[in-house]
Amino acid sequence: MLRIYLLLCCSFFSFAAYADSNVWLLVDTAARKIEVKKGQMTLETLREIAIGRGGAGLKTHRGDNITPYGNYRIGWIGERSSFRKFFGLTYPSAEDAEKAFRKGIIDRLTYDRIVTAHQFNQIPPQNTPLGGQIGIHGLGSADLRIHQTFDWTHGCIALTNTQIDHLSQLVDTGTVVKIK
């Protein structure tokens, strides 16, 4: 009986601490919100996000401060970030690489490295001419008033510290993130 009790307790705590693999995020840059979704159902909405200083759209080069449109996954989670928590996205995607290669922004070797990383479910190179280190993060010690007034990131999506702490309970590496 004790064994069953311990098994049930361990199962419950393992389940409670693990994010649902069917949950995904829709980042609506125009509406400045993130919808936490399961299938087509919206479970909750995080409002008043900030995006890159350059707005949102097609990133063309490192340092353009644009939040990229596209479909990504959370590739890694930095629990001890200067922005409180950092959910690194698998940017650039294979589609980003294809567009950049066609436009002559990246060479064939860079294109191949990005595509191969995605084929093997690895994090794509973060040091290409397209940039990298795009993610969802909190404020850390940044000024909440600036966050509420301006788009201030270098291309990331920023939430308040309370929001990022809450979101960290709902997502994990592998969570799909669609940015539009």
Report the location of each language-model feature:
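Positively charged n-region of N-terminal signal peptides that target proteins for export
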Residues: 1-4
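N-terminal signal peptide c-region/cleavage motif recognized by signal peptidases
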Residues: 11-16
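A structural motif detector for short, solvent-exposed N-terminal "entry" segments of globular domains
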Residues: 18-55
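Exported/periplasmic cell-wall-interacting domains
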Residues: 20, 66, 76, 80-180
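Well-ordered beta-strand positions in beta-sheet-rich domains
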Residues: 24, 46-48, 71, 86, ...
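Structural motif
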Residues: 31-33, 71, 133
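Short, solvent-exposed loop/turn elements at domain surfaces
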Residues: 35-37, 43, 56-60, 82-84, ...
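Electropositive
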Residues: 44-73
